[in-house]
C-alpha cells in the first residue's frame, strides 16, 4: 500500500532511464515500488518535450528514454535520478542556456548525483562549472552549485586530478570575484576561492584581505569572515600561524568570537604533537562543553589537507561514539561523525569503518546508521569504476 512504502519503510528508489523504459531500482534488493508521478523532459527533433509519467512498477515503458534531458524537470518525484549519456552530453552543451531556472537547478543536481553514482567524472563536473556558471545569475543556483563544486573538488577527485584542475579553478573563482559575478554571487565565489585556495598567489591575496587590503567591489567581510580566513591561512601556511593569531586578537572585539578562535586555533597547528593533544583532549567529556566548537576542532583536525596524518584518529572517533551519545546533545553523535569522517577519502579509512562495524555486530542501530551515513562518500568512492 502507498502508506506502507512511503511512511512506514526506509529507503528510496534509484530511477534510471533505459532503452526499454524507466527502471525503479530498490537498492535493498527487495524489489519494492514507490508509486509516484515524474515530469520527464526529453528532446524530440530539436523540441524539448515535457510529459507526466506515472511509475507503478519496477519497469515502466517509455519510448523516449534515449533522448531524456531531465528525468524529473518539475521535481515531482522521490528518489535518486541518474543522468543518461544523452542528458550528460546535452547539459554539457546547453545547461547555461536553459531559460527555466528550475530546470537549470535540476540539471546541476542531476549531474552532481551523477558524480556520486559514478555516471559523471568529477573532473568533468568541475570543468562544466567553469564553463557554465559564469552565465548563471540566480543566487540560489550559484550557491547550490558551488556547494556541489566544493564537495566534488575535496572528496570526489584524486590528488592528481585536483592538482591538474587547481590553477584553472582558482583563476575561475578569482575572475568571478573581481570581474564577472554580480551582487551576492561575488561573496559566494569569494568563499569558494577561500575553501579551495592552494597557490601562494591566492593565499597572499587572502592574507592581504585579512590585513586590511581593499576588497573587491561588492564584497564585504565581517569578523566571522576574518576568523575563517585566518583559519584557512593557518592551515595552508604553517608559518603564518602566529601572524594570523596576532591579527585576529588585535582586530576582533567580539568576546564570543575570540573565545571560539582561541579554542579552535590549536587544531590548525603545524605541529602534529599539538594537534594530537587537541584531539586527545576532545575525547575527555569535560572538554566537550561547547559541542559546536568541538565539532569545528575535529573538522579542522581531519581536514582534507591533513587527512593522511589524521587517519590514526578515526578508530578513536568511532570508539568514542557511544560516550558521545550518552554525554552529549541528541544531535552531537551525527556532528561528531560528520566532522571526523567527511574529510577522509582513503581506502584505509574505508576499511577502518567496515572493520569497526564488523567487530561490533550488536552496535546500537541508530548509531550504526549514523556511521553508515557519514561514511557514505567512502562507499561511493570505492564501489566500482566510473563509466564516463
Feature names for model-found ranges:
Residues 1-388:
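Non-catalytic accessory/interaction domains
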Amino acid at each position: 500500500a502507498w502508506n506502507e512504502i512511503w511512511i512506514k519503510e526506509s529507503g528510496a528508489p534509484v530511477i534510471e532511464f533505459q532503452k526499454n523504459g524507466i527502471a525503479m531500482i530498490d537498492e535493498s534488493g527487495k524489489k519494492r515500488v514507490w508509486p509516484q508521478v515524474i515530469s520527464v523532459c526529453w528532446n524530440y527533433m530539436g523540441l524539448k518535450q515535457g510529459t507526466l509519467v506515472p511509475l507503478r512498477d519496477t519497469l515502466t515503458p517509455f519510448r523516449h528514454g534515449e533522448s531524456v534531458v531531465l528525468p524529473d524537470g518539475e521535481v515531482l518525484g522521490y528518489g535518486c535520478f541518474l543522468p543518461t549519456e544523452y542528458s550528460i552530453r546535452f547539459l554539457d552543451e546547453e545547461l547555461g542556456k536553459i531559460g527555466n531556472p528550475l530546470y537549470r537547478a535540476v540539471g546541476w543536481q542531476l549531474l552532481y548525483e551523477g558524480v556520486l553514482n559514478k555516471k559523471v567524472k568529477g573532473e568533468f563536473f568541475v570543468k562544466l562549472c567553469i564553463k557554465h556558471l559564469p552565465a548563471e545569475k540566480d543566487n540560489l543556483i550559484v550557491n547550490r552549485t558551488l556547494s556541489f563544486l566544493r564537495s566534488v573538488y575535496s572528496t570526489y577527485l584524486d590528488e592528481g586530478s585536483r592538482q591538474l584542475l587547481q590553477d584553472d579553478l582558482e583563476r575561475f573563482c578569482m575572475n568571478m570575484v573581481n570581474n564577472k559575478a554580480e551582487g551576492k554571487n561575488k561573496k559566494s565565489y569569494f568563499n569558494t576561492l577561500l575553501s579551495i585556495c592552494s597557490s601562494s598567489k591566492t593565499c597572499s591575496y587572502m592574507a592581504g584581505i585579512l590585513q586590511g587590503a581593499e576588497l573587491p567591489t561588492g564584497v564585504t567581510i565581517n569578523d566571522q569572515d576574518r576568523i575563517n580566513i585566518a583559519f584557512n591561512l593557518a592551515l595552508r601556511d604553517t608559518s603564518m600561524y602566529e601572524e594570523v593569531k596576532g591579527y585576529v586578537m588585535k582586530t576582533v572585539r567580539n568576546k564570543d568570537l575570540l573565545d571560539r578562535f582561541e579554542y579552535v586555533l590549536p587544531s590548525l597547528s603545524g605541529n602534529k604533537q599539538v594537534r594530537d593533544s587537541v584531539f586527545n583532549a576532545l575525547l575527555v567529556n569535560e572538554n566537550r562543553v561547547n559541542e559546536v566548537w568541538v565539532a569545528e576542532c575535529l573538522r579542522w583536525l581531519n581536514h582534507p589537507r591533513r587527512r593522511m596524518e589524521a587517519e590514526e584518529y578515526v578508530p578513536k572517533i568511532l570508539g568514542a561514539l557511544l560516550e558521545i551519545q550518552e554525554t552529549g546533545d541528541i544531535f552531537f553523535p551525527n556532528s561528531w561523525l560528520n566532522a571526523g569522517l567527511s574529510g577522509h577519502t582513503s581506502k584505509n579509512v574505508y576499511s577502518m569503518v567496515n572493520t569497526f562495524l564488523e567487530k561490533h555486530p550488536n552496535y546500537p542501530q541508530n548509531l550504526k546508521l549514523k556511521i553508515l551515513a557519514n561514511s557514505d562518500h567512502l562507499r561511493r568512492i570505492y564501489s566500482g569504476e566510473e563509466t564516463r
